[in-house]
């Protein structure tokens, strides 16, 4: 399933950017309190609504980071399931929709190291921020991720 991810934060950044959905302006929300950087390009999927009331979050595996506000066509391959102080905050994992990535079709095709890196980042990136917390509950496969995506589309339309 092909999706479009609007990247807010490039891989390797400690800047937490947010795009204003009404104006399209990119704002610096904060500089991460922890000495950690985003493990992959990170953004959201338009016309979806996650359990936290924001568009569904997504990470993209690609060979080179892009700039904030760039839209990347990618394929859903899995989901990191988590909650934070605002409730459910799942992160879809996707891969660049490019034939050079045809060998990655499901979460089982992603290295354990990369999954561990992503999980560690999201479980700990808010550790030094008062009143914030994250609980990770593991990985889901492509089918589960696509179901979460479909539910987020329905939630947006409701």
Curated annotation (Swiss-Prot):
Q: Keywords for this entry? A: Cytoplasm, Hydrolase, Magnesium, Metal-binding
* Any GO MF annotation of the entry: magnesium ion binding
Q: What class of enzyme is it?
A: hydrolase
Alphabetized InterPro entries for the sequence: Pyrophosphatase, Pyrophosphatase_sf
Q: Active site at which residues?
A: 89
E.C. no: 3.6.1.1
UniProt-listed PROSITE patterns:
PPASE (PS00387)
Gene Ontology BP, a term: phosphate-containing compound metabolic process
Q: Which residues bind substrate?
A: 16, 30, 42, 125
Give the reactions, separated by semicolons, that this protein catalyses: diphosphate + H2O = 2 phosphate + H(+)
> Which residues of this UniProt protein bind Mg(2+) 1?
52, 57, 89
Quote the record's binding site residues for Mg(2+) 2. Answer: 8, 57
Broad class of where this protein is predominantly found: cytoplasm
SUPFAM superfamilies xref list? Inorganic pyrophosphatase
Q: Which residues cross the membrane?
A: none
Q: Which GO terms describe its cellular component?
A: cytoplasm
Identify the residues that bind Mg(2+) 3: 84, 89
Q: Where in the cell is it found?
A: Cytoplasm
Q: Which family does it belong to?
A: Belongs to the PPase family.
Q: How does it assemble?
A: Homohexamer.
Explain the purpose of this protein: Catalyzes the hydrolysis of inorganic pyrophosphate (PPi) forming two phosphate ions.
Q: Which PANTHER family match?
A: INORGANIC PYROPHOSPHATASE
Annotated protein name in UniProt: Inorganic pyrophosphatase
Q: What is the lineage of its organism?
A: Bacteria, Bacillati, Actinomycetota, Actinomycetes, Mycobacteriales
């Amino acid at each position: 399933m092909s999706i479009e991810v609007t990247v807010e934060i490039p891989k390797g950044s400690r800047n937490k950017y947010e795009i204003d959905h009404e104006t399209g302006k990119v704002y610096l929300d904060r500089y991460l309190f922890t000495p950690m950087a985003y493990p992959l390009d990170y953004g959201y999927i338009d016309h979806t609504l996650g359990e936290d009331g924001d568009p569904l979050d997504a990470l993209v595996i690609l060979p080179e980071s892009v700039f904030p506000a760039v839209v990347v066509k990618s394929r859903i391959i899995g989901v990191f399931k988590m909650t934070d102080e605002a409730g459910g905050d799942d992160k879809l994992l996707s891969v660049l929709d490019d034939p050079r990535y045809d060998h990655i079709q499901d979460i089982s095709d992603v290295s354990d190291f990369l999954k561990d890196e992503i999980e560690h980042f999201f479980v700990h990136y808010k550790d030094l921020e008062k009143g914030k917390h994250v609980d990770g509950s593991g990985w889901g496969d492509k089918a589960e991720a696509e179901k979460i995506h479909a539910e987020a589309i329905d939630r947006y339309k409701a």
